[in-house]
Amino acid sequence: MQHKRIQLAVVDMAGTTVMDDGLVVNAFEAAATAVGVPESGPERERARQYVLDTMGQSKISVFRALFGGEELAQQANAAFERAYEHLIDEGKAAPIAGATEAISRLRENGIRVALTTGFSGTTQEKLLAALGWQSLADLVLAPGDGVRGRPYPDLILTALMRLEADSVFNVAALGDTTSDIESALRAGVAIAAGTLTGAHNDRQLRDAGATHVVGSITDFAELILQNR
């Protein structure tokens, strides 16, 4: 099927537009310690691997799967958010090279941009403030009431509705994880692209069904603009 004109780009944050450099894993270590997971050994290794495998998903959903009970999951999530926000306060958050310019270029060419995350809305807002990105995109979205995180399609479909794209065939999505790709495929978007700036590699992204794999968000913007 020939793609229709892209009207909306839905773009992930950590690993896609924001450098990760181990920040998510470091914050997870604090969360695991907070709920009593031994600091070394097979239990810790299994939990760490699960976090790596589920990169891109809603963090509270990851902790529910890991720790079972809601109380432990909420405790772990709160510790994760505190640790990640502390890393932001220490100046550890930085944009991926060219991300600001790529997003601005898309918008200058009439393409709306939504920034999405698996973090809470509070952490997302803090990250945006640290980067000076409060007005960079048309919309920012995080999982919450009535909006499930990845791999569900809710973030993409919510962006489509709020930014009034004509259909999913007018939407392109970009992320660095297999969860991003699964979410985009479930939403039925025209372009479900993976980027090599984050958690998962070319083979993992293609095996997940990515329609395109690009080197960075700069290449993603070029892909969209070349196919208008």
Where on the chain are the PLM-derived regions?
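Glycine-rich phosphate-binding loop signature in dinucleotide/nucleotide-binding domains
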Residues: 2-4, 108-111, 163-170, 227-228
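Conserved Lys-Pro-Asp/Glu-containing loop-to-beta segment of HAD-superfamily phosphomonoesterases
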Residues: 150-181, 193
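Surface-exposed amphipathic alpha-helices with a cationic face
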Residues: 100-108, 160-161, 181-186
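Substrate-recognition element of Asp-dependent hydrolases with the DxDx(T/V) motif
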Residues: 28, 80, 99-131, 141
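A short, structured active-site edge motif that brings together acidic residues
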Residues: 50-51, 133-149, 170
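Acidic, Mg2+-coordinating phosphoryl-transfer loop and its flanking beta/alpha structural elements
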Residues: 172-212
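N-terminal helical cap/lid subdomain that shapes the substrate entry/recognition surface
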Residues: 3-101, 105
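Structural recognition of alpha->loop->beta junctions
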Residues: 132-142, 204-222
